[in-house]
Amino acid sequence: MNWLFKKIGLVARQSKPEVVESLLLLSHHLESQGLHVFIDRDSVTRSQAQGLTLIDRSDFGKIVDVAIVLGGDGTMLSVARLLAPYRVPLIGINQGRLGFMTDIPLHQMLDSVSAILSGEFLPEERMLLQSTVVRDGVEIAHHLAFNDIVINRGAMGQMIEFEVFVDNQFVYSQRSDGLIISTPTGSTAYSLASGGPILHPTVPAISLVPICPQSLNNRPIAINDSSEVEFMLTRGIDARVHFDGQAHCDLMELDRVLVRRYRNSLKILHPLGYSYFDMLRQKLHWGERLL
């Protein structure tokens, strides 16, 4: 078989033995096909690592042609942020819960992966967000987000007050539990639970979704993905900004969070026959067609 990708990186969630078992099965299968397999060092234990080629996850972008994630969307998020700067595509094997991004079921893993690696796939470009936290004119933090950037109240439980600007134009001031700045990928996550819209992955938009606003006039809005969003905390003693729920930065009053689309997109490779709407219908338990 002619392979389009020959150097394959594998990542799994080590805390789940059944996931690691699937990773080892896939690794042996790919190596038997003559492919070079590199496994994330943190995905297996020392006893499981015998005979495997281990590398740090942070080195994947420099070495592999494609990365395969076995687990849930949380694992996919962390790997996506690492690989986006290198434009390395991702394949997701679902061994988590919902699996909006890890769409290949376990029982189809070997056949689907082999087909994709040989060039039979549907590519899908997904945008990321880049953010900068500014305090007293100094940039104190930089992060990427694949799903969303969330600014919210902390453990004190008090509402925060903030102002939002888009391309230096004032949009609104708000008193609420926080704000979700979401990509189309993240529109089916926290944003959706907070009343935000579902955005198709190809829609060039960023959504701004209030979290429990004091005024019911504050509604979600979608803006062009070429825009820059500026969030300024005007009142809040215990506020924090989260990046994909996996990194955070504590905020002080008058801190600003600047958000824009990241320069690179991330390519996800789906099996032939994949449909975004089929996935939504399955994950969200929508009704089937009547005719």
Swiss-Prot record:
Its main location: cytoplasm. One of its GO terms (biological process) is NAD metabolic process. Its cofactor is a divalent metal cation. GO terms for cellular component: cytoplasm. It is found in: Cytoplasm. The active site is at 73 (proton acceptor). HAMAP family: NAD_kinase. This is NAD kinase. The lineage of its organism: Bacteria, Pseudomonadati, Pseudomonadota, Betaproteobacteria, Neisseriales.
